């Protein structure tokens, strides 16, 4: 078997190794983030590689980053409570309005493959207030949200890692991630997934997501999760 790196467009365009996820429907097909190709090539090249590997009897596992998004297209005003990055249990201030880059409209893709757009309501935390750039080392918990349960207990709660942290408790988020997974299986033919940064995502989410994909595929999928501990 062969584990291939994240194949979709990241915030760094052709230089992004894939973990700064911008658009999971762009496998090197659209002019976004100043590049059509990803670091690993075009969509056509990726699909050809997967096809040839499978023809040779080699299973292919796709690196999959479900934890966060980065490189939003629009800033959105929202309210949030600040926490120190090293302490997710005790707020360091009261809720206030911030300006967060949480609007993902993917103008370069223009609705091809999916019309879903991300907004602040689909995330639970960010780490930068563009109206207050001097405030660093801060995690902003968005209004009405909570840090995911069933995650690593480092820093009291290690649900937040980077970028715009997906709110897996939001039904639209779960539906969209399942929709993307089905699309990815149909379009690439991969045999399974390597799930990135699972200690930052609620453990209860994965059985639901995998069940939806395996029902769609009509078979068991090989899945392994990355859980990094210092």
Would you name each region that the model predicts?
Residues 12-27, 67-150:
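Aromatic- and acidic-residue-enriched segments that line the glycan-binding/catalytic groove
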Residues 2-40, 58, 209:
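Aromatic-lined carbohydrate-binding/catalytic grooves of carbohydrate-active enzymes
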Residues 3-6, 131-140, 159-169:
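Short, mixed-charge, low-aromatic patches
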Residues 3-14, 64-73, 197-202, 225-229:
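Short, solvent-exposed turn/loop segments enriched in Gly/Ser/Thr/Pro and often Arg
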Residues 6, 19, 49-54, 58, ...:
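Active-site-proximal helices and loops of the catalytic beta/alpha 8
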Residues 81-82, 88, 142-182, 187, ...:
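Active-site-adjacent "subsite" loops/lids of carbohydrate-active enzymes
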């Amino acid at each position: 078997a062969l584990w291939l790196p994240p194949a979709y467009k990241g915030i760094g365009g052709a230089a992004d190794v894939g973990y700064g996820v911008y658009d999971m429907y762009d496998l090197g097909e659209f002019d976004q983030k100043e590049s059509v190709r990803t670091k690993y090539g075009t969509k056509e090249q990726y699909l050809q590689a997967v096809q040839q590997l499978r023809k040779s009897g080699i299973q292919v596992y796709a690196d999959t980053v479900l934890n966060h998004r980065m490189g939003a297209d629009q800033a959105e005003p929202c309210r949030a409570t600040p926490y120190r990055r090293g302490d997710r249990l005790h707020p360091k201030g009261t809720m206030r309005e911030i300006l967060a880059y949480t609007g993902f409209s993917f103008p370069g893709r223009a609705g091809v493959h999916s019309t879903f757009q991300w907004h602040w309501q689909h995330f639970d935390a960010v780490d930068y207030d563009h109206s207050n750039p001097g405030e660093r080392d801060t995690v902003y918990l968005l209004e009405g949200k909570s840090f995911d349960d069933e995650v690593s207990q480092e820093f009291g709660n290690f649900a937040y890692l980077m970028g715009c942290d997906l709110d897996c408790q939001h039904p639209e988020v779960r539906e969209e991630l399942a929709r993307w997974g089905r699309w990815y299986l149909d379009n690439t033919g991969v045999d399974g997934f390597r799930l990135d940064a699972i200690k930052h995502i609620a453990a209860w989410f994965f059985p639901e997501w995998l069940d939806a994909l395996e029902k769609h595929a009509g078979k068991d999928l090989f899945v392994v999760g990355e859980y990094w501990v210092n």
